[in-house]
């Protein structure tokens, strides 16, 4: 799991940053939906400020999954996401 991104506010709910054209973003959302994990979706194609914030932190790949507490994963596999959720 990656460290905390200083410029990203600590979310109260798991937050997924991605785009509608991203296959990994769809897979991540399907996984979260399938496990009934509540999350907030931020479409970077519609939210320029969020996209700029991620880019300013060197995060150019999606999805970026930010967990409560501020830790984040970039392009996590389903097993990586499951482990992060179990640890949070």
Language-model features, listed with the residues they occupy:
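ATP/adenylate-binding site constellation spanning eukaryotic-like Ser/Thr protein kinases
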Residues: 19, 59, 78
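Local sequence-structure signature of Cys/Sec-based thiol-disulfide redox active-site neighborhoods
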Residues: 2-37
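Structural micro-motif
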Residues: 57-65
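Non-catalytic, surface beta->alpha helical segment in thiol-disulfide oxidoreductase systems
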Residues: 67-88
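Short amphipathic alpha-helix with an adjacent loop that forms part of the alpha/beta core around
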Residues: 52-57, 83-85
């Amino acid at each position: 799991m990656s460290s905390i991104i200083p410029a990203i506010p600590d979310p109260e709910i798991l937050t997924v940053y991605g785009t509608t054209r991203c296959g990994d973003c769809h897979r991540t959302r399907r996984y979260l939906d399938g496990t009934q994990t509540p999350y907030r979706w931020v479409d970077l194609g519609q939210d320029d400020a969020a996209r700029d914030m991620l880019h300013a932190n060197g995060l150019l790949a999606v999805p970026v999954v930010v967990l409560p507490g501020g830790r984040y994963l970039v392009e996590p596999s389903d097993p990586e996401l499951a482990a992060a959720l179990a640890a949070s």
